[in-house]
Regions:
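Structural motif
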Residues: 1, 12-17, 42-43, 83-88, ...
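Short beta-strand elements of ligand-binding domains
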Residues: 12-14, 33-45, 152-161
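Short, conserved loop/helix-junction motifs that constitute active-site signature segments
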Residues: 29-35, 74-75, 148-152
Length: 170
């Protein structure tokens, strides 16, 4: 609190852990900042009361709409697999959007917390959320190759947060 008058604005990207204790602590701190000085960037915190500035992405609607562009291809797959941790920032919004999209379009969906050989099955599609340093994508492709599956022919991968390394991995 002693620093609240030191700056004209506080620009915060609220990518905090989603567990209840962390969120409670973060909300307590953020509510101390006067609304006129607070600007949230990239992620909206619906739990934070007040009339503060915010510029954010609507991850849920963007994901839902993006999946719609691939609906025809998704309908050819027997299951939509999402690999993520429930504590990830993207799980809360993108995971919900994937569930809603699959329900609305009658597509089987399954959530996983890790990539194991058992979840890699032919004619299925995979989405990896929060893949740190693309390790999740690398692991998925490595395990698929061990099973003699080719990406694009035997399994499909939806890239979230596209990066140049995908060109090499895939």
């Amino acid at each position: 609190e002693e620093n609240l008058d030191l700056f004209d604005y506080y620009v915060i990207t609220p990518h905090f852990p989603l567990d209840a204790a962390s969120q409670k602590r973060v909300l307590k701190i953020l509510t101390r900042i006067p609304n006129r000085k607070l600007i949230l960037v990239d992620h909206w915190m619906k739990e934070l009361p007040g009339n503060y500035g915010a510029v954010y992405q609507d991850f849920a609607n963007d994901a839902y709409e993006g999946l719609g562009y691939g609906l025809k291809k998704l309908k050819t797959c027997s299951r939509f697999n999402v690999v993520t941790l429930p504590s990830s920032l993207y799980y809360a919004s993108v995971g919900e959007a994937v569930e809603r999209f699959c329900r609305d379009n009658d597509i089987a969906v399954e959530f996983h917390t890790e990539i194991t050989p058992e979840i890699i099955r032919e004619k299925e599609v995979y989405l990896i959320l929060n893949s740190q340093y693309d390790l999740g994508l690398i692991e998925l492709v490595r395990r698929a190759r061990e099973l003699n599956f080719r990406v694009g022919r035997d399994i499909s991968i939806i890239s979230y947060n596209e990066s140049p390394i995908n060109e090499i991995i895939l």
